[in-house]
């Protein structure tokens, strides 16, 4: 008797466009490439302590409406220019969302938000949007969730994140070791920092792993290691943005032979999932920076045109410029917190 033992739970397999198809359709312009190169260099210098500005990764929790995102980007670019003496502002452009259980996984996975999962469409939309944002002079940041998607968009990312759910994953540490941009590792969902510290050391080393080429062929990838990695404090069972927590992290980093470079996420467990509390976290962090704390090299903020969030499940028409995932602060608060951070940096300089 013959047994069928393979693909028993696979309903359908569809061909994915090879990365080269989108790289040729939407090649990086000279402006876009220049934006990425300069932002990566600036972040590298901040991480090495050669630039005393603050890295600010700010933007929507997730991207679902390119039109609203372009408007947000245009506004943010104006602020980036105004505050460039104190802040290196990079827009958070997250196309993929890790879920605790189930839910909408982001624009690349389900661009039409109707469970049609037109991933080829999602990749096209994502690359074109990233290209437009970078071409305008605004650098972009994203979260990396798998080993394939970076081949479509990583050349347009100035900074990358590995999330709390994936920081402990060997695959993601290997991926980070080969990314061309600086990478931040979040502490674990329970608040432990050791997994992030271990991840930084692991990503700094060379690795050999499986991925795909730009032509979509399965490949063996050898990396040289990424020396531009750092920790992101996002809270856990309790917030971990206070001066006491920062001091503890500095000790942990020193024991691991790593520089005291810390990014603080104003959202997630640090704000107890209450978006308005990002302003309270920001006030505390500004106080630490103004007080001379140089280990805080960056912050992350969830912000959109309209504050709060909305449900995809309600069946109601979506509000323009409002998050469909985590709640964000609105534009007015965005301007306020960025100017406060810039003033804190000025004070830190003395």
For each feature predicted by the language model, list its residue ranges:
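Active-site-facing alpha/beta catalytic cores
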Residues: 2-6, 73, 86-241, 245-246, ...
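Gly-rich Lys/Arg/Thr-decorated short loops/hinges at beta-loop-alpha junctions or inter-strand turns
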Residues: 18-27, 223-235, 318
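Conserved phosphate/anionic-ligand binding catalytic regions in large, soluble enzymes, centered on
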Residues: 55-68, 326
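Conserved, mostly hydrophobic/aromatic
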Residues: 59, 264, 330
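N- or domain-start disorder-to-order transition segments that initiate the globular core
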Residues: 9-48
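A contiguous, surface-oriented mixed alpha/beta subdomain in the mid-to-C-terminal portion of proteins
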Residues: 233-236, 240, 248-263
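Internal helix-turn-beta structural module
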Residues: 304-347
């Amino acid at each position: 008797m013959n047994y069928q033992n393979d693909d028993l739970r696979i309903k359908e397999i569809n061909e994915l466009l090879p990365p080269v198809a989108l790289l040729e359709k939407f090649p990086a312009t000279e402006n876009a490439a220049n934006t990425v190169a300069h932002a990566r260099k600036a972040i590298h210098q901040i991480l090495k302590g050669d630039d005393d500005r603050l890295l600010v990764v700010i933007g929507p929790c997730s991207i679902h409406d390119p039109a609203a995102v372009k408007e947000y980007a245009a506004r943010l670019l104006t602020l980036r220019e105004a505050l460039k003496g104190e802040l290196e502002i990079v827009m958070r452009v997250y196309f993929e969302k890790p879920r605790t259980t189930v839910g909408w996984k982001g624009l690349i996975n389900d661009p039409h938000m109707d469970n049609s999962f037109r991933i080829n469409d999602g990749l096209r939309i994502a690359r074109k949007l990233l290209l437009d944002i970078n071409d305008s002079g605004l650098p972009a940041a994203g979260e990396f969730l798998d080993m394939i998607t970076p081949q479509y968009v990583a050349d347009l990312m100035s900074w990358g994140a590995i999330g709390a759910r994936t920081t402990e994953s060997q695959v993601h540490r290997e991926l980070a070791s080969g990314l061309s941009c600086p990478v931040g590792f979040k502490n674990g969902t329970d608040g432990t920092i050791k997994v992030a510290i271990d991840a930084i050391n692991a990503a700094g080393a060379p690795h050999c792993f499986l991925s795909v080429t730009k032509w979509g062929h399965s490949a063996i990838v050898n990396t040289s290691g990424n020396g531009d990695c750092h920790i992101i404090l996002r809270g856990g069972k309790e917030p971990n943005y206070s001066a006491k927590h920062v001091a503890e992290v500095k000790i942990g980093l020193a024991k691991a032979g790593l520089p005291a470079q810390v990014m603080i996420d104003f959202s997630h467990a640090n704000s107890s999932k209450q978006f308005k509390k990002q302003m309270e976290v920001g006030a505390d962090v500004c106080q630490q920076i103004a007080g001379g704390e140089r280990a805080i090299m960056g912050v992350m903020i969830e912000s959109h045109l309209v504050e709060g969030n909305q449900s995809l499940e309600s069946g109601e028409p979506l509000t323009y410029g409002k998050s469909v995932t985590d709640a964000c602060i609105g534009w007015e608060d965005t301007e306020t917190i960025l100017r406060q951070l810039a003033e804190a940096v000025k004070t830190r300089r003395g």
